[in-house]
Amino acid sequence: MLVGKQAPVFKATAVVNGEIVNDFSLQDYVDKKYVVFFFYPKDFTFVCPTELLGFQAALPEFTKRDTVVVGCSTDTEYSHWAWCQKPQCEGGISGVTYPLVADTNKTIADAFDVLAGERYVDENGKLQVKGELVAYRGLFLIDKQGIVRHQLVNDMPLGRSIDEAIRIVDALQHFEQYGEVCPLGWHPGQEAMQATHEGVAKYLSNNSERRMQNN
């Protein structure tokens, strides 16, 4: 669990707006931007392009919230680049402009604790691998101080909700600005609450009808 801790620091090669760049680091955003950092299993697969293209379509919403989006998988930068060149009608992700990090040595996925597969040393002292060392669908919201404030990890068949990622950014920023905590399903413009007995009592009283409708 990384929530409440400093996000792991790394430097890696990435593809940014169709160009290969060296020494990419999330540290460059500290004190400047919020970061939605997400992992996906593989380039040229099936659920993954729906997520990557979905994040691209929602990029203006993240930008309005002073938030950058960064993707990462264990593929090479050349695989990322080739996938970015391939038309969407052929399963590609042409049009994706945000950074795609190449975690070829698996250390970033391992540091964020989303690396699938098992590694162990056998009785002969040799490193063995069971399963494929690719990333689960992890997503991390990192604040401007570089602290992980939210994490979500899905198994590989389960795509994520970009609307929920945006909602979590909104909730964090509301808390930072107003000091109010954000209850179940909160969206901007809805009532939040003070983290006190009086605050929760007021919230529950004001929203009892809405809870009944949701049930």
Q: Could you tell me what each predicted segment is?
A:
Residues 1-215:
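Chalcogenol-based redox active-site neighborhoods
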